Amino acid sequence: MGNLDDNKFTWVIKNVPTLNSDMLFSNYFVIGGCSWRVVAHSKENNFKESLSLTLIVAEDSAQKMGCGWSRYAKIIFTLVNQISEILSQRIETMFDQKSSVFSSETMFSIGKFDEHFAGFIVNGEIKIVVEFLEIIDKLVLSKESNPPFKKTKLNNDGEVSKDLIREVPVIMESIVVNGFHVLPSQVEFVKRIFEKHPDVAKEFRPTNRIVKTAYMNVLLSLIETLRQSPREISKNDLDGACGLLRSMKEAGFKLDWLEKKLNEVLEKKEKEESYETRMREIEEEMKDLKAKALDVGAPLRLDDVV
């Protein structure tokens, strides 16, 4: 269930203590002329240790925007603490034709979630707010490229209203690759995965089209993340990747090859951080040595001689 208020989308996840899934999807909602969805993911499969929040561009909106589109968005994720304070994280990110889903992720590593520790789970509920500060269409930079925020209603039962259905048409085009519906821009990428790893989804059982597409998009996002250099990937990104990879494996994907790559990136990241720490230490040591050298080379005072 979710509710819209101008440029904000509020999502309440209920019955958290009894959830048996580590990945949840909000309803679709329309803001700035684009359809979006939020994904909540728990590393520990219980939504009590940590929480990753991901914003995705809906597949139908990606199709509607056509070839070569890109969209800049400035977002604030807020995890509402119902007892004391609010935990939020601001994100500025670019969505485009190649990375329209799972493109922007933020992880809240805040320890225990339940009301006895942090106040994020109260009466079995977590409250999440996504606020859009700015959306800019980078394909055509004009007065119309930044459409005004549009409020879209949900029915009392939490289902999408007819207004939203009219605003977001059905998926116009997708191509099936090994049983997965993907965007035309993703076809070659997905084909390459199945050519190199034919058993990657052999034990993946879900048959729902939306669920299958969401999992495939997670896989593509993980691969894109790990293609970056360790310097470009943050520690939070890698923590989130570890959690998502675990979920993918639990869902039936065979990803030993991707896990190996992730471990390599983690090792490189640790080495990079270690080298950077050592470089800072060396710089401090050099400053001390220079100061000592200047002190040694300084002329003696009269009192030092007489």
Swiss-Prot record:
Domain (MATH): residue spans on this chain: 6-132
- Tell me which SUPFAM superfamilies the record gives: TRAF domain-like
UniProt entry tagged with the keyword tRNA-binding: no
Is Transmembrane one of the keywords?
A: no
Residue ranges that the Swiss-Prot or TrEMBL entry lists as coiled coil: 253-298
Instruction: Quote the InterPro entries the UniProt record gives.
Output: MATH-CC_domain_protein, MATH/TRAF_dom, PLipase-like, TRAF-like
Q: Which UniProt keywords apply?
A: Coiled coil
Q: Which Pfam families match?
A: MATH_2 (PF22486), PEARLI-4 (PF05278)
Superkingdom of source: Eukaryota
Protein name listed in UniProt: MATH domain and coiled-coil domain-containing protein At3g29580
Taxonomic lineage per UniProt? Answer: Eukaryota, Viridiplantae, Streptophyta, Embryophyta, Tracheophyta
